[in-house]
């Protein structure tokens, strides 16, 4: 009996070990993708943060890139000086981001009624502001400044209560980091930022909320090895489990993740799952300067959705 029990334990341990995803593209790809994502068809993508206060870009621009406009002195700089004054800084918008009418349960119920199967919340965009109490963003998160609420945590609970999958968008780089300022500091000098900030912060987010979907972004100035893509993807899969899935925005050299065409007609030939990402207008975040005709009508939206689903998305 003792020998049989020992044999069973050995077999069980081997099974557990073999189920672990190793930090190699071969192991990650052997793990594959969960069927639920292919079946889901419709998800909700939420861009809501400090950039939602000015909510401004050119008529065709991305409002969530507001901070970048201040860096390059485009028309957002003139807008800010005209409306808020020359001494007003982007950081001054944070206390104005209050979310006083926000009801996560109401949102989740609406998402459920829409037919969506999963929700993606921008946990941190390129401005570095976090919608959870990240220890790596002191004084620059939604619990310490702004609404004083854990947006990631509250929405995750509400969404899962409705039987939907919860996921997070996470920007790999930041415009505001004091360790490495994206688009300002040399791309190759990103090592310390990745090792001491990005990796521990991303692991903090995943460990705390166990998101089923991880959508990274802002990868394009560095490669997959610099972002430690293999290590992070395998760690994420081993941490969250078999329903977890990542996207493909990990830099040059990435070999895994669902494809993410942006404002496109979709993909017809691919060896991976894919999901087009877009706003109802030309911006993901609210752009008060965007004309109404930029927004898709209900008929246009349904027609576009049918085209994407018919193509396999």
Question: How does the language model describe each region?
Answer:
Residues 1-4, 111:
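Positively charged n-region of N-terminal signal peptides that target proteins for export
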Residues 6-15:
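Bacterial N-terminal signal peptides
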Residues 19-313:
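Mature catalytic domains of secreted/periplasmic carbohydrate-active enzymes
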């Amino acid at each position: 009996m003792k020998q049989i029990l020992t044999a069973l334990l050995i077999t069980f341990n081997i099974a557990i070990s073999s189920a672990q995803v190793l930090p190699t593209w071969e192991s990650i790809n052997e793990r594959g993708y969960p069927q639920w994502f292919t079946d889901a068809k419709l998800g909700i993508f939420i861009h809501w943060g400090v950039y939602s206060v000015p909510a401004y870009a050119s008529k065709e621009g991305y409002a969530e890139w507001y901070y970048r406009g201040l860096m390059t002195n485009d028309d957002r700089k003139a807008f800010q000086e005209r409306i808020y004054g020359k001494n007003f800084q982007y950081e001054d918008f944070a206390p104005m981001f209050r979310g006083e009418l926000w009801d996560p349960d109401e949102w989740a119920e609406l998402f459920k009624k829409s037919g969506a199967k999963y929700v993606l919340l921008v946990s941190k965009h390129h401005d570095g502001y976090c919608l959870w109490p990240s220890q790596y963003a002191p004084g620059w998160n939604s619990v310490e400044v702004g609404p004083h609420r854990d947006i990631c945590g509250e929405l995750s609970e509400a969404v899962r209560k409705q039987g939907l999958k919860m996921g997070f968008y996470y920007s790999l780089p930041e415009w505001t980091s004091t360790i490495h300022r994206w688009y300002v500091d040399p791309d190759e000098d990103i090592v310390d930022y990745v090792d001491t900030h990005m990796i521990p912060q991303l692991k903090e987010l995943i460990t705390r909320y166990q998101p089923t979907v991880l959508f990274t972004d802002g990868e394009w100035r560095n490669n997959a090895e610099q972002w430690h893509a293999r290590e992070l993807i395998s760690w994420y899969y081993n941490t969250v489990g078999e329903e977890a899935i990542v996207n493909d925005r990990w830099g040059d050299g990435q070999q895994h993740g669902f494809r993410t065409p942006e404002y496109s007609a979709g993909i017809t030939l691919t060896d991976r799952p894919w999901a087009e990402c877009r706003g109802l207008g030309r911006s993901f975040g609210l752009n008060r300067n965007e004309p109404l005709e930029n927004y898709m009508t209900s008929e246009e939206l349904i027609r576009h959705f049918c085209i994407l689903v018919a193509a396999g998305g």
